[in-house]
Amino acid sequence: MEPQKGIFIAESAKVIERAVRAGYEPVSFLLGERWLDQMMPLFERLAVREGAGPVPVFVASMELMEQLTGFNVTRGALAAFRRPRQIPVAEFLGGVVEAAGERPVRVCVLEGIVDHTNVGAIFRSAAALNVDGILVSPTCCDPLYRRSARVSMGTVFQVPWTRIGSEARVWPHDGLAALRDAGFSCAAMALTDDSVSLDDPALQEIDRLAIFMGTEGAGLGAKTIAGCDRAVRIPMAHGVDSLNVAAASAVAFWQLCPHVSNEYHYQPGLYH
């Protein structure tokens, strides 16, 4: 669990810029000397924000940055941001349903995923493939952790997310109840005797669908699978029975989420 109050660290110019664009409040910046010019346009925008105070910018050699942080800062830029308020699940689900309008709603529930790289990769796929929101269980790692945010390429600041479930000892019952109260059908990505194929047309007809993804190795818990309305499997060849959770999420999102235009829109300042 991440602290309810405090800060998180973003690493790399791209990730920092996406955090700022998403409305996260910076506390301070630490840059390698050669990254200062690249970051100046962002600092100039921050300087003219209405009602915002000054944000300190510290510039140091890469050697000093490594001494200060305790790791190799390969991306050359770090920023501390204030952690936002955690949105209650009912409010969160109401928001994503309202934002979706008339189209089907798709959310993903991450159960107990402890690898920050996988969490970041799942968020990146969710942003690309039109997932409406992500909910993380009490034992899932922090999406705002530095490595998660970096692997996601900053999409953790784009995809709406919140915690679901009050504590591990009552999971998944409280999480499943919250989703059903909001009108969601729950699908466990799991290989069971009665699982349906991901390409089953009936899945596309579900108006509000929560896709449950399990932890690395063990997958979803037995209580979670039993509590969901159905289990769903990805059809695979050559005797392979599972994929890495990040890869599996991308396949599931592509199949189950409404497809969007394939036009690519360049956004200055976000892509380098």
Q: Can you say where each PLM-predicted feature lies in the sequence?
A:
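Short, hinge-like loop/turn segments at secondary-structure boundaries
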Residues: 45-48, 76-77, 151-155, 204-207
